[in-house]
Structure formats: C-alpha cells, structure tokens
A protein has these predicted regions:
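Bacterial N-terminal signal peptides
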Residues: 1-8
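A sensor for short, sequence-defined functional sites
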Residues: 12-664, 670-674
Length: 678
C-alpha cells in the first residue's frame, strides 16, 4: 500500500474536517502497534454504502525503518473531489518510544493544493489535495494516519457502487482488514473477481457485513497469454444496480440527442456539409468521425459530475475539446441527424474481456464509443482515436464487450471481430544486393501507416530538422531492416489518414557462408514466427490462448540479386494462404534471373484459441517457421576476387550515402569514420 494512497480520490466540501471517525466504524487495532516490525503494521479499510453515499474509512500505519521510508513519509497527501464529498482526518500521530505524538492536537494543518495531477494526460478532475508536512520524523517511528471520505456521485441519482483491489501476499501487513457494510434492506449485490476466497459474511444490527482479513493469499499465477478474465487480480465489486439493463437505463438520461443540435447552429452546418458531400451513409459516418477525432481535442473534465455526465454537443464543438463521453455524444447527435442508426456504448479499454464476469456497475467500464449500424454491419466508432478514414472504419477495437446505453435498458453485447480490409502498415522495400555478397546492401524503404498507426507520425511529418527525421527513421527501421539510414522523409496525407516514411539506407552482413554457398535468410511479415503458449501446469491445461490485435502487416520486397549470380536457389515455402494460431498468413515468392520478388502479409484479430487446439496451432506455426525462405548462391564472386576498379564502382553508391550523413551533421566524427571505412 503506497504512502500516497491513504484515501482514494474522495469527495463535498473544500475544507478538511477534523472530527471523530463515523459511529459505525469498528476499530481494528488492539495493541502492539508501536512494537510491530512489519512495514505496514496496520491497514484497516472499512466501507459503508447507505442512502446513496459511499463512505470509505482508512486507518493505516507505517513503520519507518529506513531513510527511504522516512523521506517518503515526509509529506502525506490526501486527495478528494469536493464536488462529490468531504475529506475528514481523524488521526495523525507519531508513535515513538512508548509515547504518542498527536500532530493534529499540536496544530499541524495541511496545505490545500488544487492541481491537476493528470493534466499531461489531458485530464482535469478538480481534485483537491491536503498535503501534510510531517515534522521531526525519526528512523524507528511509526506514523499512523486515519481518515475517511464520502462519495455521492450526482450522476448515479442515489445508486451506489464501490470497487477495490484486495491486498494480497506477498505484501506484508501486521494487522489488516477490508470490511464492507450496508443496510440489510438495501438492494446491494456484490462479487469478487480474481483468485480470492469468499469473505466472511454476516448480518449485524440491521446491516450486512463482508469482511476480508488482509493480506489474502497470493493468487496462483496465470499464463500471460490467457484471456483477460483469467488474469484479473483479487478485487471486490459492490453496487445497487440489479443488472446490466439497470446500469444502461440509469445512464441513458444523459445521452439523449434530441434537441442537442440547434437547427441553424454550427453543428447543423457541419451536418449539412457532410450530407452535401455524399449520400452514402458509411461515407457520411466516416466524415463525421474524422471531424470529431481531428477537430475536437481530447480533454477529460471530471469536475461537477463530469466523470459520468457528458458535455453538451454544442459546447464541445464551440470549445473544440471534450472527453470520450463528449466526443461520443457529439458524434451520436450528428449521425442521428443524418438518419444513421447509432447508439452510445460503454466499454473497458483496459480489460474488456473481464466485463462479462463483473458485477453490473458503471465502474466496470472506463470508456465510451459509438456503435453505428449501417447496411447490416456494426461499426465501432471511437471519437478519441485518431486517423480513422473510410478505408479503416471497419476495424473493430479490442474491447470484448459493450453495454449499449438505452432508455429501456440493455444487456452486454459482444464486440464481434472481423478481418480488416486494409493493412495497418504496408512496407515496400527495394533491396539492392547487386554490389556483391560481401558488400553492404543498399535499400529504399517506402512505408505507409494507416489509421491510428499513421496518426502517430503526424508530429514527425511536421518536422523541418532533417537530422531528427533521419533519426526517427533509423529508430523505427532498426528492428525492421537494421543498418544505417542516410536519407529520409516523412509525410502525412490528412485526407487519406496515411503517413508515409521513405528512407534510404544500407544493411550489413546479409549473407552467411558455408562451403562456397552464400545464404540470405529472407525476412518479411510471415517469417521468424513462433507460437509457444505454456500450459504445462495442470491448472493451466484448460485455459485458452488470447491473440492480440487487430493488426495487419503487408510487405513487398524486390531484391536486386548480386551481379553474375548464375546459380541462385530459393528454398522454403514460397506460397502461403492459411489461418494458423489465429493469424492469417499469405505469401508469394518469385525468383527471376536478376531479381527476387517477395510478397507476404499477416493479419490477426483478438480471438481465443481453445486449449484443446493449441497443439495443432503449435504444429502449424512450426511448419510455417521451418519453411522460412532462404536465398542460396553457389560460388558467388567474393570481394577479394574483384579488381580495384570493380570494387570502387560497386562501392560508390555506398560512399555517396555516407556522404549524405556528413552533410546532415558534418561535425559527427562517426560519420566521417564510416565513410572512410567504405
């Protein structure tokens, strides 16, 4: 439990209250705290859900046994959201040599800071922070902090929710507890997620009580490639929502679009512009999505209930900023104004697969997008993404499940995947080996990036410093081709949503030699694959494998073979068109007299491979990997067999390339040395 997590963002006055703990709190500490040698001698979290308010009480103590922990405890910060509740501090004490030093009684008060800790992530939440500068701490002290916070979310209209990770071993706690309670008559439901035993449960004085002793047992390890529902850490979710339909219905009042676009307003003008440009619904949707992505900056305003309450579309467009809710509502209003069937949906961008096993609460989600239904197909439109265009609008994000926001309520629906129509990256390479098997290979790489992958290159495309551009190209290509880049340019086609990187460079040591044969191992999207999910443990044998994606990579390589290479052979699998381990592989290779053409692609979307099919998947990938193409040249002309004139002629393009590096930065000694070596 980090020092700075003494109270979760809480929450309705702007002044810290110094009062006794709530009457319902049952203290856990029973002596021996000052003598404890655990780093966290005490951790007591108690939560009460009642009358639409969630109260969170925390009593925590730290043993300061090192200079590092002493420094960390020098300032204690308690944060809260004043639009939703209060922060109360009940105790701030130092236990030293059998004495109790009451810092609050001694007049210690915090500095109240209003700062946006997430501003670099474009997030404004109105958090206030009470920063206590603790005086006179010494090694061996025990610092004890007791506080509570209240949370009443205006968007939930009296409904309540609570979710928290459960502290597990190997975290060491001397005495630890997590206790939750609510009136027996309250319609509260709860669920534990992850590998954790059920809590003790009983009814007491008209309240239902759940109690965990902390830390709970360390969860059994899970394979990293398992679906997300298997990898959830221990946590508890509690809420007053009866089911997902209840969650959907409760949110729907905030996402109606009727009357949100003024008939003669700015948004109506944009709608008219799009309708005039095309009468094809999908093209209209793509244009509206582009407008929301490109012309409205992302900014989360969590103040005044903004974590769930959306900004009005007219305000979003006027300010040109908004979060996922604001962008989604703006996009939704525009689509409906154009007669396109659409609705807002809640998703979890971090672990969507776990939503299906979650307790129905709004907190199971962290993101909102729009689901449009056009010509029988669902399109999942994310206004916070970037670079989406008609060619990529059909790509399905990896969210797993979605909750439609409807006035009548709705259940979870799957975010069903489909194969993308356009590659995220198209790599075209001219690979010039004509100088010989001992010479560096000259190459020109022409790469197109689409969608969000392309949008990431916008900054580089705007750069004027050629040295920085070449550096960016070098960094990207070092794991694709390697070697040295000596010239590059980066552009971004805003209309197409495509970034283009064109680079010239040279690669080294592209051949291996054995008994007079030079071998070059062809690289591409379909080469160097492996598939080795570990299911050796008996507890893992029924756990499926989860693929990544969606991601589609296509490559086109054109080789200029070494001069006077009469005996060139191609081994390996020259054609592929199959689905293996959840990945589509395509390959076509053609060896000519002076050239070698290699075209291939891979595509995978999020899916699960049942444990029973993993053996077949391993064998399929092993077979594909064993057929990685290899070019073999028998009796190639070696460098020492060439005369000086031929060597000079063949090396001149390489020297010219090195000279371009010197032109970029003439005082770089390494560039001069490189050219000198050539």
């Amino acid at each position: 439990v980090p020092l700075f997590v003494l109270a979760a963002p809480v929450l309705a006055g702007e002044e810290v209250r110094y009062v006794e703990p709530p009457a319902w709190v049952e203290p856990l500490y029973d002596g021996g705290l000052a003598e404890s040698r655990d780093n966290i001698p005490l951790y007591d979290r108690q939560v009460r859900l009642e009358d639409g308010t969630v109260t969170r009480y925390t009593d925590i103590a730290y043993w300061l046994d090192t200079t590092q922990t002493l420094q960390q405890a020098g300032t204690i910060q308690l944060a809260w959201l004043p639009d939703k509740g209060d922060l109360a501090v009940h105790r701030l004490e130092i236990l030293r040599d059998g004495a109790v030093i009451d810092l609050l009684a001694g007049g210690l008060r915090p500095e109240i800071l209003r700062r946006e800790r997430e501003l670099e992530r474009r997030s404004v939440d109105g958090v206030l922070t009470a920063a206590f500068a603790i005086p006179g701490l010494k090694i061996g002290d025990v610092l004890r902090v007791t506080s509570s916070s209240t949370l009443r979310d205006q968007a939930l209209a009296g409904e309540m929710q609570f979710a928290e990770g459960i502290v597990a071993e190997p975290t060491k706690i001397g005495l630890g507890r997590l206790r939750l309670s609510w009136p027996e008559s309250a319609p509260i439901q709860w669920k534990t997620l992850g590998d954790v035993a059920a809590p003790e449960s009983w009814n007491e004085s008209g309240y239902t009580v759940l109690d965990f002793s902390l830390p709970v047992a360390e969860p059994d390890p899970m394979p990293e490639d398992a679906p997300g529902r298997f990898t959830v850490g221990p946590q508890i979710q509690v809420g007053s929502f009866t089911d997902w339909a209840h969650v959907s219905q409760s949110m729907s009042r905030y996402f109606t679009t009727e009357g949100t676009i003024a008939p003669a307003g700015a948004i109506a003008s944009e709608v008219a512009r799009i309708e005039h440009a095309t009468d094809v619904p999908l093209e209209r949707a793509a244009m509206a999505l582009r407008m929301v992505q490109d012309e409205v900056s992302y900014l989360l305003n969590g103040m005044d209930g903004g974590n769930y309450l959306p900004q009005a579309p007219e305000l979003t467009w006027a300010n040109r900023y908004g979060d996922c809710k604001a962008k989604s509502l703006l996009l939704l209003a525009m689509l409906r104004a154009m007669g396109i069937e659409a609705e807002a949906v809640l998703v979890d961008s971090d672990n969507g697969d776990a939503v299906a096993i979650s307790q129905p609460i709004p907190g199971a989600f962290d993101h909102m997008i729009v689901r449009a239904h056009i010509a029988g197909t669902d399109y999942w439109l994310d206004g916070t993404n970037a670079g989406s265009r008609l060619a990529t609008i059909d790509e399905v994000p990896d969210f797993g499940w979605a909750l439609p926001i409807r006035s009548e309520g709705a259940d979870l629906i799957p975010v069903t995947q489909r194969w993308p129509q356009a590659p995220d990256r198209l790599l075209k390479v001219t690979y010039d080996m004509s100088a010989g098997v001992d010479m560096p290979v000259l190459y020109t790489a022409d790469i197109e990036f689409r969608g969000s992958m392309g949008a990431r290159w916008r900054t580089e495309a705007a750069l004027d410093d050629q040295m920085i551009v070449v550096g960016a190209a070098t960094k990207y290509l070092e794991d694709v081709i390697g070697g040295v880049v000596y010239d590059a340019r980066i552009t971004y086609d805003d209309e197409a949503g495509v970034a283009r990187l064109v680079a010239e460079g040279m690669a080294f040591d592209q051949f291996e030699f054995d008994r007079g044969v030079a071998s070059h191992y062809v690289t591409g999207a379909t080469t160097n694959w492996s598939f080795q999910p570990d299911r050796a443990r008996s507890a893992w044998r029924e756990i499926p494998y989860r693929t990544g994606g969606p991601l589609t990579m296509a490559e086109q390589w054109t080789y200029q073979l070494p001069e006077n290479s009469d005996a060139v052979q191609l081994s390996g699998i020259d054609t592929l068109d199959e689905l293996a381990a959840g990945t589509r592989f395509t390959r076509a290779a053609e060896l000519g007299e002076e050239t070698f053409e290699f075209r291939d692609s891979t595509s995978y979307v999020p899916t699960e491979i049942p444990a029973a099919e993993l053996g077949d998947a391993r064998r399929a990938i092993r077979r594909i990997a064993s057929g990685d193409p290899v070019l073999r040249i028998e009796g190639p002309a070696r460098l020492w067999e060439l005369d000086d004139k031929t060597i000079a002629r063949r090396l001149q393009p390489h020297i010219d390339g090195a000279s371009k590096l010197i032109e970029l930065k003439s005082d770089m000694a390494a560039f001069h040395a490189f050219r000198g070596t050539l």
